[in-house]
Amino acid sequence: MTRSSVLADALNAINNAEKTGKRQVLLRPSSKVIIKFLQVMQKHGYIGEFEYIDDHRSGKIVVQLNGRLNKCGVISPRFNVKIGDIEKWTANLLPARQFGYVILTTSAGIMDHEEARRKHVSGKILGFVY
């Protein structure tokens, strides 16, 4: 299997483990983008704790699942999103208003769409979680 993207593979592994009812999942390789994405998911309660394991290669992450995640995914290519267009993207990607988050990478870091709107920053769209 060819790797489309490290983040896409990690989120796909989380989705598959969640569907099969697993309590934890091992992600490898790891990257800073994956860790920041997981921090946003953890902040909103979609996953439990996660631990980075340094194996002197690319690293591994063990994620504890809590059963609250319905779906998470990557948007590829990473489209530029202006502040005014965030609402359109949330309407397209999320199943309902006030349900789930679109995750963006901005100049102020990786954050969800509500935080980006509060901080008044735009950026590129990474993915979604609900």
Swiss-Prot record:
GO terms for molecular function: structural constituent of ribosome. Pfam families: Ribosomal_S8. SUPFAM superfamilies: Ribosomal protein S8. The keyword Zinc-finger does not apply. Keywords: Cytoplasm, Ribonucleoprotein, Ribosomal protein. GO terms for cellular component: cytosol; cytosolic small ribosomal subunit. Component of the small ribosomal subunit (SSU). Mature yeast ribosomes consist of a small (40S) and a large (60S) subunit. The 40S small subunit contains 1 molecule of ribosomal RNA (18S rRNA) and 33 different proteins (encoded by 57 genes). The large 60S subunit contains 3 rRNA molecules (25S, 5.8S and 5S rRNA) and 46 different proteins (encoded by 81 genes). Belongs to the universal ribosomal protein uS8 family. This is Small ribosomal subunit protein uS8B. It comes from Saccharomyces cerevisiae (strain ATCC 204508 / S288c).
